[in-house]
Amino acid sequence: MASQEIEALSGALARLPGLGPRSARRAVLWLIKRRETALPQLLNALTQVQELLVECGVCGNVDTSNPCGICTDHRRDQRSICVVEEVADLWALDRARLFTGKYHVLGGRLSALEGVRPEDLTIGSLLDRVAQGGIDEVVLAMNATLEGQTTAHYIAERLEGAAVRVTQLAHGLPVGGELDYLDEGTLAQALRARRPVG
């Protein structure tokens, strides 16, 4: 039987996304075996996160400064905003280095089942950013889920009448994906979004 301290650490780790109780116990055992090297590094990294990281008051990104490095980077396209559900989505898109504008993190997506309403997200501050002017395009980069598409549709409706072009990421076949393994919804979306070759 493990001590209370080990159980407490396992329980804390098990609350992290993607880690269940068994994975958390394995992580704790790994840390115990390497307590002289790995544990101090982990403690230092966690302390740094707690002390230094803040949420950007403009876009919702997590950074060491407010506004964040993306919002203050004048080399980025000031006239386009890419709207994402979560910070992880922002990071994924920015790693691809294809979008060079600014971002806006909603902090989730609309969901009747989970009781998430427009006022629970940062849609209002997005509309304020667009209303201030200087924005030519809003790219809706929501996940290809029912809730994500509902959120995108809601935002597009709210932006009707604004002098801004609203676009959405294309959905369809993943690179390397085999048709045989794809669901009907993905295949249907890929067919609808088809474009000429050449």
Curated annotation (Swiss-Prot):
<dbReference type="GO" id="GO:0006281">
    <property type="term" value="P:DNA repair"/>
</dbReference>
<feature type="domain" description="Toprim">
    <location>
        <begin position="79"/>
        <end position="174"/>
    </location>
</feature>
<keyword id="KW-0862">Zinc</keyword>
<protein>
    <recommendedName>
        <fullName>Recombination protein RecR</fullName>
    </recommendedName>
</protein>
<keyword id="KW-0479">Metal-binding</keyword>
<keyword id="KW-0863">Zinc-finger</keyword>
<feature type="zinc finger region" description="C4-type">
    <location>
        <begin position="56"/>
        <end position="71"/>
    </location>
</feature>
<comment type="function">
    <text>May play a role in DNA repair. It seems to be involved in an RecBC-independent recombinational process of DNA repair. It may act with RecF and RecO.</text>
</comment>
<dbReference type="Pfam" id="PF13662">
    <property type="entry name" value="Toprim_4"/>
</dbReference>
<dbReference type="GO" id="GO:0003677">
    <property type="term" value="F:DNA binding"/>
</dbReference>
<dbReference type="InterPro" id="IPR006171">
    <property type="entry name" value="TOPRIM_dom"/>
</dbReference>
<dbReference type="GO" id="GO:0006310">
    <property type="term" value="P:DNA recombination"/>
</dbReference>
<comment type="similarity">
    <text>Belongs to the RecR family.</text>
</comment>
<dbReference type="Pfam" id="PF21175">
    <property type="entry name" value="RecR_C"/>
</dbReference>
<dbReference type="InterPro" id="IPR000093">
    <property type="entry name" value="DNA_Rcmb_RecR"/>
</dbReference>
<dbReference type="Pfam" id="PF21176">
    <property type="entry name" value="RecR_HhH"/>
</dbReference>
<keyword id="KW-0227">DNA damage</keyword>
<dbReference type="InterPro" id="IPR023627">
    <property type="entry name" value="Rcmb_RecR"/>
</dbReference>
<keyword id="KW-0233">DNA recombination</keyword>
<dbReference type="InterPro" id="IPR034137">
    <property type="entry name" value="TOPRIM_RecR"/>
</dbReference>
<dbReference type="InterPro" id="IPR015967">
    <property type="entry name" value="Rcmb_RecR_Znf"/>
</dbReference>
<dbReference type="Pfam" id="PF02132">
    <property type="entry name" value="RecR_ZnF"/>
</dbReference>
<dbReference type="GO" id="GO:0008270">
    <property type="term" value="F:zinc ion binding"/>
</dbReference>
<keyword id="KW-0234">DNA repair</keyword>
